[in-house]
Amino acid sequence: MAQIPSSRTNGSGAQMRVFGLHVYGNFYECANTELLKSPEELEKVVLEAAREGGMTVLDIKSWKIGEGVSVVAIILESHITVHTWPEYRFATVDVYSCGGHTNPHRAFEVLAEALKPARVEKGVAERHLE
């Protein structure tokens, strides 16, 4: 995969290699309900998020599932996914990148700016090898 972003120690002092950063979350009460329903427009936003996050898109696919949409972007550094439920004004987002040159937090922000949630639950996980 891409370069290893950093090296850290765990709680017992052992060295860990951090291979990737996974930024994920739930978007509640999204104001942009039309975007929640449009595979084509949501793909554009995911491509912009990848660009803003310094990621290289290899492929992107979307599916209309009921009223909602699922978008999966395979990036050179890993992936970005968005799943929507317009009837609940809700979306889930995952941005996972193994590239130290990327900014998954920025990609996540771009998605939030577009969907306009009233509330965001955000999590971050370092993927590492001890």
From Swiss-Prot:
InterPro entries: AdoMetDC_fam_prok, S-AdoMet_deCO2ase_core, S-AdoMet_deCOase_pro-enz
Site (Cleavage (non-hydrolytic)): 77-78
Needed cofactors: pyruvate
Active-site annotation: 78 (schiff-base intermediate with substrate), 83 (proton acceptor), 98 (proton donor)
EC number, as in UniProt: 4.1.1.50
GO biological process, one term: spermidine biosynthetic process
PTM text: Is synthesized initially as an inactive proenzyme. Formation of the active enzyme involves a self-maturation process in which the active site pyruvoyl group is generated from an internal serine residue via an autocatalytic post-translational modification. Two non-identical subunits are generated from the proenzyme in this reaction, and the pyruvate is formed at the N-terminus of the alpha chain, which is derived from the carboxyl end of the proenzyme.
Cofactor binding annotation: Binds 1 pyruvoyl group covalently per subunit.
Pfam families: AdoMet_dc (PF02675)
A Gene Ontology term for the protein's cellular component: cytosol
Catalytic activity: S-adenosyl-L-methionine + H(+) = S-adenosyl 3-(methylsulfanyl)propylamine + CO2
PANTHER family: S-ADENOSYLMETHIONINE DECARBOXYLASE PROENZYME
Record text on subunit structure and interactions: Heterotetramer of two alpha and two beta chains arranged as a dimer of alpha/beta heterodimers.
Physiological role: Catalyzes the decarboxylation of S-adenosylmethionine to S-adenosylmethioninamine (dcAdoMet), the propylamine donor required for the synthesis of the polyamines spermine and spermidine from the diamine putrescine.
Protein name per its UniProtKB record: S-adenosylmethionine decarboxylase proenzyme
Name of the coding gene: speH
